[in-house]
């Protein structure tokens, strides 16, 4: 068993940003474990632009954004292992992994950062009726086939789900010569960013059918068509069926944080996000185990992933240098009146720096509301927002000094503007 200071599980955007921040914060013995054949994670197949506006103040493609961090990792001489699968994470932070070169090996780090990212919700989790023919892909799989493998999955396409990947693939398939017939969304609102709806659907004349879902798939060897129906109260409305002749169905029905390792180690998970429940330092219930990026909760922009992961790297460095976290009272963070979840779920005011960052999503579309944060019964933050939607994550930065004092909880809520 080898002793190291910091092990980062995952070499995607979160893992890279965390490693760079930890090294700059003084941690020398860092090891990144990545199961793929190259660093960068999902960014390597995201060849569209729109990345880096917050982090680098310029517009980059996914591979360009990843390359900026990979370059920093190499310049800082941070060690990493590719084609390495982490098999187990124990409660005492022992990491068991294997690869072709080293075989089966174990590491005992002082701290661990979870940066495994997320995966797409598959067809089996959607309970779509019909046959199981060829031609049904998750949007991310189709993205990899088109952008990295040079294969076009189909010619006539219907997309179920209006998440950002689905919207982007509607545009990408159109640019590659396919005909995207429509994007169907179960909810009465889109799950993606407004800018993606405009740039990927409106600009290409692709219809977005809200409150619709797939009720049947035709075809045995290959998809020959699908049937959509309008949805009310979560159920298809009889008599509203529409048939589309297509050879491909892409699924963009949400992302699931990949937390099998976390669960095996005993990390407490947030039932809403599916990711670890963390405090203001992005530390889980296991001391010295931190989480950041899409393994924690699904983000809209990779810039926010990098920002969050850098904070996790800095907190891990402080934990390693101090040998543990400082003591202090712990305040739960509660959600009310339309706030779906928050990260973090607990705050230790005495352990926070100058500011505490709260990230959250709402559970529906709200107009002319005010975001309010209470410490006990005292309002310590408020901001008016003309529109709030589930597809866009909200960020609130609180002064840590306002969190100290009487009161048994922090409450994030929506009020009339």
What are these regions (language model features)?
Residues 292-336:
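A conserved FAD-binding loop/helix module that cradles the flavin
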Residues 4-68, 144, 153-197:
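Beta1-alpha1 glycine-rich phosphate/pyrophosphate-binding loop at the start
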Residues 68-97, 174-260, 354-386:
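A Rossmann-like FAD-binding core segment of flavoenzymes
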Residues 114, 136-146, 248-299:
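FAD-site-proximal beta/loop scaffold in flavoenzymes
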Residues 1-5, 82, 317-417:
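Rossmann-like nucleotide/phosphate-binding core characteristic of flavoprotein oxidoreductases
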Residues 104-105, 111-208, 213-222, 288, ...:
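Predominantly flavin-linked oxidoreductase catalytic cores and closely associated redox partners
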């Amino acid at each position: 068993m080898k002793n190291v200071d910091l092990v980062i599980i995952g070499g995607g955007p979160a893992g890279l940003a965390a490693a760079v921040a930890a090294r700059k914060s003084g941690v020398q013995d860092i090891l990144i474990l990545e199961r793929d054949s190259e660093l960068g994670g999902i960014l390597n197949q995201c060849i569209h632009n729109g990345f880096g506006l917050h982090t680098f103040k310029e517009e980059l493609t996914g591979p360009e954004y990843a390359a900026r961090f990979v370059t920093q990792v190499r310049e800082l001489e941070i060690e990493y292992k590719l084609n390495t699968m982490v098999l187990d994470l124990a409660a005492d932070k022992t990491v068991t992994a294997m690869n072709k070169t080293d075989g089966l090996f174990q590491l005992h780090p002082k701290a661990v950062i979870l940066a495994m990212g997320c995966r797409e919700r598959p067809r089996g989790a959607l309970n779509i009726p019909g046959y199981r023919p060829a031609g049904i892909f998750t949007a991310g799989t189709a993205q990899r086939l088109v952008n990295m493998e040079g294969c076009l999955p189909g010619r006539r396409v219907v997309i179920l789900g209006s998440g950002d990947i689905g919207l982007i693939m509607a545009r990408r398939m159109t640019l590659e010569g396919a005909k995207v017939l429509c994007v169907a969304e179960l909810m009465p609102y889109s799950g993606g960013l407004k800018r993606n709806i405009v740039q990927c659907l409106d600009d290409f004349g692709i219809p977005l059918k809200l409150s619709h879902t797939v009720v049947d798939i035709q075809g045995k060897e290959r998809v020959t068509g699908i049937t959509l129906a309008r949805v009310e109260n979560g159920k298809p409305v009889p008599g509203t069926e529409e048939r589309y002749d297509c050879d491909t169905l892409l699924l963009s029905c949400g992302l699931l944080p990949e937390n099998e390792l976390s669960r095996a180690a005993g990390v407490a998970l947030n039932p809403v996000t599916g990711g670890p429940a963390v405090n203001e330092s992005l530390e889980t219930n296991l001391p010295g185990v931190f989480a950041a990026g899409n393994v924690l909760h699904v983000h809209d922009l990779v810039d926010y992933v990098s920002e969050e992961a850098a904070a996790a790297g800095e907190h891990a460095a402080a934990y390693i240098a101090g040998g543990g976290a400082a003591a202090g009272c712990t305040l739960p963070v509660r959600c009310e009146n339309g706030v779906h979840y928050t990260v973090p779920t607990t705050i230790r005011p005495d352990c926070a720096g100058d500011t505490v960052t709260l990230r959250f999503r709402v559970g529906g579309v709200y107009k002319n509301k005010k975001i309010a944060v209470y410490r006990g019964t005292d309002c310590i933050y408020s901001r008016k927002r003309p529109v709030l939607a589930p597809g866009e994550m909200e960020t609130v930065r609180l002064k840590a000094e306002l969190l100290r004092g009487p009161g048994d909880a922090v409450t994030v809520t929506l009020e009339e503007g």
